[in-house]
Amino acid sequence: VFDQVRERTGFSAGLATLIASEVVNLMTCAAEIGGVAICLQLLSGLPYRLLIALAVVGLIVVCWVLPFEWIERLFGYLGLCLLVFVVAAIKLHPDWSQVAHGFVPGSSSGSSLAVYLYFVVGLLGAAMTPYEVYFYSSGAVEDRWSRKDLGLNKVTAIIGYTLGGTLSVALMIVAAVLFMPRGISPEFLGTPALSAAHVFGQVGLLLALVGILFAVGGAAIETSFAGAYNLAQFFGWRWGKKERPSGAPRFTLSWVVIFAVALVVVMTGVDPVKLTEYSVIFSVVALPLTYLPILLVANDRAYMGSKVNGRLANVLGVAYFVLILVIAVTAIPLMLITNGGQG
C-alpha cells in the first residue's frame, strides 16, 4: 500500500500518512498486548506487568519461529473459542423481537444525539481498521496472488465479516440480558467472559478467555507486521514474513521494535480498553489518507488491467470515500464533545 501512497500523494504527504498510520498501529498493538496480559492474568493470577513482558516475548518468539501459515492456524482456530458467546446468547433465551428491534437505528437509552453518533463512528471505525488493509494487501503480494485467488478471498472476507458481526451481536445480547438489569457496565476485558461462566460454568469461562487471548494476540501480530510492511514499502526496503531475518533485516527489526515500543506504552499503566477506543477513533481519522490512493490505483488501467474500476464501482467508491471523510472529520470533535461517549 505505502509505495502507492508515496507515489500518488508525494513524499511529504505520504510521510505524514505513514506517521499517522504508524501511530495508530502502535496504539492498537499496545492495546492488544495489554489484552493478552489481562487474559493471562485472569488465567494464572500472576502479576500484570510481568505478564506484559512475557506476552511480548512470547509473541516475538512465535513470529520469529513459526511460518505464517502456522500462526494463522494457531491463532485463528483457538480464536474460534469466542463462539461460546454465540451459544451463551442463545441459551439465555433473549426476547428475540427486542433483538430484531435493535437492528433499527436509534437510541433507546436516553443518550444525546452526539453520544449516539460517537458510537456510530466507533463501530464503523472498528469495522474499517486500516491495519487490516496494510496487512492483507501485503500478504497478497507476498503470496503472489493471481486472479484465481480473488474469488476465494472474497468468500473468506464475507465469512469473516459475518462471523465477526455475529460475535458482536452475541456480546451485545449477553450484555443486555445479564449486565444491564444489574447495572453493570462491562468496562473491563474480563467482564464479558463472566457471561460464558454464567451459562457454562468454569468451562465456559476458560473457553471465553482462551478465545479472547488468541483473538487479541493475533491482532497484536497483525498490527506489528502491518507497521513493518508500511515502513518497508514506503522506504523501499526488502520485506516479507517469508524472508529470512538476515535477508530483510530492516523489516524484521521494524516489527520487533514495534512490539518493544508497544511494551513500553503498556508498562506505563494505560488502560488497554481505553487505548483500544482511542486507536479506533484515530484510525478513522487516518483512513481517508490511505483509502484515496487505493481508489486512484483502482482507476489506473496500467496497474489494474481488465480489473480497473467500472462506472458503478467508481460511484460506490466515491460515495464510500465521502462517507469515511465525513466520519474522519467528525470523529475527534464527537470524542471531545461526548467525553469519549460518557455524555
Task: Give residue spans per PLM region.
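Hydrophobic transmembrane alpha-helices that form the core helical bundles
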Residues: 14-45, 51-56, 216-235, 271-275, ...
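Flexible loop linkers connecting adjacent transmembrane helices
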Residues: 1-13, 38, 69, 182-199, ...
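Extracellular/periplasmic helix-exit of transmembrane alpha-helices
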Residues: 141, 162-191
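Hydrophobic alpha-helical segments and their helix-loop junctions in multi-pass secondary transporters
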Residues: 80-107, 117-137, 294-302, 327-339
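Transmembrane alpha-helical segments of multi-pass small-molecule transport proteins
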Residues: 16-22, 42-65, 81-85, 247-262, ...
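Membrane-interface loop-to-helix entry segments
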Residues: 54-55, 63-93, 280-282, 287, ...
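Loop-to-transmembrane helix boundary motifs in multi-pass membrane proteins
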Residues: 11-12, 49-53, 159, 163, ...
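Membrane-water interface regions at transmembrane-helix termini and the short interhelical loops
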Residues: 32-43, 55-78, 266-272, 303
